[in-house]
């Protein structure tokens, strides 16, 4: 499938070919950048999201993330909408939970199953332009925004209209298609046999790293919008740090410090991603690059930084135990690269019901630090260096972006799963309308059954408590389909090491019943029991729980 560059191609050529003075974008409408990293874990940064810095924070260099944390708000309890990519991405574009849209697995995945369960019917083609959902880029475009997609899309399936972000409301698409990872590798894959899945990157040179290429294109797109004095929404969707892991040439030498090769590669990819963030910040702060920031649009640009799901843990990461790492700082770090350890203190990682699979880094900041420079800042006065501990969910991004843009939410109230975070960011009263929910009725990869939580599940967080309903993996008694429930107090047990289901059965049953009622409300797809070819029977209200 060949993708056009944009609906604005002629205008962009004009902007390049005729020298004009760069002027700030319309101050009445703030620019919004969603900087979305792929598979980045809560600990994969030098910014500490735990109560205290950990050894993981010392293993990575992300200075531009630290810049955002210093100038904006850090969310320590931010959650992806799902433990794998496409569902979270669709949630952020629609404001609806993946259970409601039925985009509840990664687009392109076949029928996933473990020994006793298989996938229910789901929206396997992903987001489509003729679907029932209002799309964020479409809504913003109708209200005067230029909408720009850069990098990984993975919204719609191969060969479908939704594979092209332009059909979903983006004016410009650079690099986005049906692919869920860096097909063809990280070094100029747009010049090889996969060139068609990297639309409009063909003018980038041979040998260029993919992260760098999409960054250059993002900076160009920002430049065009500034020249045209047009407010913009940019979905800056990194391919990093998705597998296959490969070193970023500009940064790998800085990680030859005793860590395993795959971990050195991973760290270099993170630093390259952070450098991408830095390039975008610099473009906003000094658009024409002359050192004079009088033309800055940073004060009128909001950046939301986050990840689409929890970090890789067992999948492709090193599993060799403790290693002494001596980074350039000179400090010796005892790093533990054991199985299921890479997101600690969070349990497990991508694909899992546990915190390591869904808790993600999140920063929100104005790119510039002159709060009185533009009127819109008065309605969203983010306190520099603030920490927000309220649990938030990526279902919230849609409503938040519209609120920041001053655009009415077109989704009927009963169909909204997220809510605006503007009051929370502004230090005003914020009350969560409903618990946070996750639903994954599929098997991410292979028949695991080893306590990683990588199996079909539904989960809910309400206040400090999190309940998980596992549909069954047959491990407990070897006789087949065998559902179970787990309960955790995250305020006391962030690592989810102490299942409270047996000691607090009343609370567990109440929360489980609320979760099951919500599944019915949104008509969530339920895993199919292989031997009966029927959906798994959900527990009746008040029924007893099985505890391991």
Tell me the role of every PLM-derived stretch:
Residues 52-89, 95-100, 146-147, 168-177, ...:
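Short, structured active-site-proximal loop/turn typified by the sulfatase FGly-forming signature C/S-X-P-X-R
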Residues 9-19:
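Bacterial N-terminal signal peptides
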Residues 28-33, 71-76, 142-148, 168-171, ...:
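Loop/turn elements at helix/coil->beta-strand transitions in domains of secreted/extracellular proteins
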Residues 172, 324-355, 365, 369-375, ...:
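C-terminal cap/loop subdomain of S1 sulfatases and analogous C-terminal strand-loop tails that border
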Residues 161-169, 244-247, 285-381:
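Histidine-centered active-site microenvironments of extracellular/periplasmic hydrolases
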Residues 103-146, 153-267, 368, 374-378, ...:
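Formylglycine-dependent
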């Amino acid at each position: 499938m060949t993708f056009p560059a944009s609906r604005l191609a002629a205008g962009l050529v004009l902007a390049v070919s005729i020298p004009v003075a760069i002027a700030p974008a319309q101050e009445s409408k703030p620019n919004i950048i969603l900087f979305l990293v792929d598979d980045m874990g809560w600990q994969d940064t030098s910014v500490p999201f735990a109560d205290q810095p950990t050894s993981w924070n010392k293993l990575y260099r992300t200075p531009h993330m630290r810049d955002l944390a210093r100038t904006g708000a850090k969310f320590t309890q931010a959650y992806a909408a799902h433990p794998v990519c496409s569902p979270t991405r669709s949630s952020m574009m629609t404001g609806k939970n993946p259970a409601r849209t039925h985009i509840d697995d990664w687009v392109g995945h076949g029928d996933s199953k473990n020994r006793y369960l298989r996938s229910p019917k789901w929206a396997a083609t992903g987001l489509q332009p003729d679907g029932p959902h209002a799309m964020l880029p479409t809504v913003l475009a109708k209200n005067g925004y230029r909408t720009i997609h850069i990098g990984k899309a993975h919204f719609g399936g191969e060969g479908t209209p939704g594979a092209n972000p332009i059909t979903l409301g983006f004016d410009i698409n650079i690099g986005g298609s049906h692919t869920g990872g860096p097909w063809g590798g990280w070094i100029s894959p747009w010049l090889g046999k996969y060139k068609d899945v990297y639309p409009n990157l063909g003018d980038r040179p041979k040998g260029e790293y993919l992260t760098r290429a999409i960054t250059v294109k993002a900076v160009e797109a920002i430049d065009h919008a500034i020249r045209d004095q047009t407010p913009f929404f940019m979905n800056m969707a990194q391919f990093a740090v998705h597998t296959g892991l490969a070193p970023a040439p500009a940064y790998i030498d800085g990680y030859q410090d005793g860590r395993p090769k795959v971990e050195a590669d991973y760290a270099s990819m993170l630093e390259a991603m952070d450098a991408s963030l830095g390039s975008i910040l610099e473009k906003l702060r000094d658009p024409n690059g002359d050192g004079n920031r009088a033309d800055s649009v940073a004060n009128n640009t909001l950046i939301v930084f986050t990840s689409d799901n929890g970090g890789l843990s067992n999948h492709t990461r090193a599993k060799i135990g403790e290693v002494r790492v001596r980074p350039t700082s000179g400090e010796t770090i005892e790093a533990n690269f054991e199985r299921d350890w890479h997101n600690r203190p969070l349990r497990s990682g991508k694909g899992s019901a546990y915190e390591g699979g869904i808790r993600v880094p999140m920063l929100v900041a104005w790119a510039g630090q002159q709060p009185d420079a533009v009127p819109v800042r008065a309605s969203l006065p983010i306190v520099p260096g603030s920490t927000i501990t309220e649990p938030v969910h990526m279902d919230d991004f849609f409503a938040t972006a519209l609120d920041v843009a001053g655009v009415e939410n077109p989704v009927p109230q009963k169909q909204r799963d997220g809510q605006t975070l503007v009051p929370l960011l502004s230090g005003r009263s914020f009350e969560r309308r409903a618990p946070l929910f996750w639903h994954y009725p599929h098997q991410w990869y292979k028949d695991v059954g080893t306590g990683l939580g990588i199996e079909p599940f539904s989960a809910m967080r309400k206040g400090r408590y999190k309940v998980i309903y596992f549909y069954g993996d047959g491990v407990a008694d070897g006789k087949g389909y065998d559902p179970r429930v787990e309960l955790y107090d995250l305020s006391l047990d962030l690592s989810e090491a102490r299942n409270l289901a047996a000691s607090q059965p009343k609370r567990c049953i109440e929360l489980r019943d609320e979760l099951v009622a919500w599944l019915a409300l949104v008509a969530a797809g339920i895993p199919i029991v292989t031997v009966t070819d029927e959906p798994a029977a959900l527990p009746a209200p008040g029924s007893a729980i099985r505890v391991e």
